[in-house]
Amino acid sequence: MFNIPAVAVSYLIGSLSFAVIVSKYYGMDDPRTYGSGNPGATNVLRSGKKKAAALTLLGDAAKGLVAVLLARVLQEPLGLSDSAIAAVALAALVGHMWPVFFGFKGGKGVATALGVLLALSPTTALVCALIWLVMAFGFKVSSLAALTATIAAPLAALFFMPHTSWIFATLAIAILVLLRHKSNILNLIKGKESKIGEKR
């Protein structure tokens, strides 16, 4: 009964674009108008405002975490199924990528996906975060780190998530994140991808 409203609320939470919100708060340009044009922490970092980039990263991760945790806390009282929780997780990411509040022009979903995974399975999220950190510090390329961690996510989920529907949701999330990184993948192949913090 409450499955559809839960998914809708998760989508709306995911639609809060912290890259745009934080940038407006600090009087910065809209991140969709410079650099890669992506409203995410990496692009905000290109502005040179490290604090704004950090807040964007935390905000985008937090909304994924809150959306799914809220559903999990209310799962029993509202009678939500495990499949509904999986749908809520996916909806938070869809909201980030296609936000209703910002003309359906959103980010690539890495931070939000991490927040979602943290709510579903902290161990899975930790594995992905560690992989991201190792790749980011090793190669200084955010997209390469994100892509590697994204590919690892469904594999880690197979071992650490308790429900099949959550594993499939993680796979769907990974596919969406990879698709949103199409241009980054092409740039990596061509050797033209920007380093972390490098202005375009």
UniProtKB/Swiss-Prot annotation:
Q: How does it sit in the membrane?
A: Multi-pass membrane protein
Q: Which reactions appear under catalytic activity for this entry? A: an acyl phosphate + sn-glycerol 3-phosphate = a 1-acyl-sn-glycero-3-phosphate + phosphate
Q: Which GO terms describe its molecular function?
A: acyl-phosphate glycerol-3-phosphate acyltransferase activity
Tell me the domain of life.
Bacteria
Pathway(s) where this gene product acts? Lipid metabolism; phospholipid metabolism
Q: Which InterPro entries match?
A: G3P_acylTferase_PlsY (IPR003811)
Q: Which GO terms describe its biological process?
A: phospholipid biosynthetic process
Single GO cellular component annotation? plasma membrane
Record key words, sorted: Cell inner membrane, Cell membrane, Lipid biosynthesis, Lipid metabolism, Membrane, Phospholipid biosynthesis, Phospholipid metabolism, Transferase, Transmembrane, Transmembrane helix
Q: Give EC number(s), comma-separated.
A: 2.3.1.275
Family recorded in the similarity comment: Belongs to the PlsY family.
Q: Mind telling me which HAMAP family this protein's record contains?
A: PlsY
Tell me how this protein assembles. Probably interacts with PlsX.
The protein's role, per its UniProt record: Catalyzes the transfer of an acyl group from acyl-phosphate (acyl-PO(4)) to glycerol-3-phosphate (G3P) to form lysophosphatidic acid (LPA). This enzyme utilizes acyl-phosphate as fatty acyl donor, but not acyl-CoA or acyl-ACP.
* PANTHER family referenced in this protein's UniProt entry, alphabetically: GLYCEROL-3-PHOSPHATE ACYLTRANSFERASE-RELATED (PTHR30309:SF0), INNER MEMBRANE PROTEIN YGIH (PTHR30309)
Q: What is this protein called?
A: Glycerol-3-phosphate acyltransferase
Species name: Neisseria meningitidis serogroup A / serotype 4A (strain DSM 15465 / Z2491)
GN (gene name): plsY
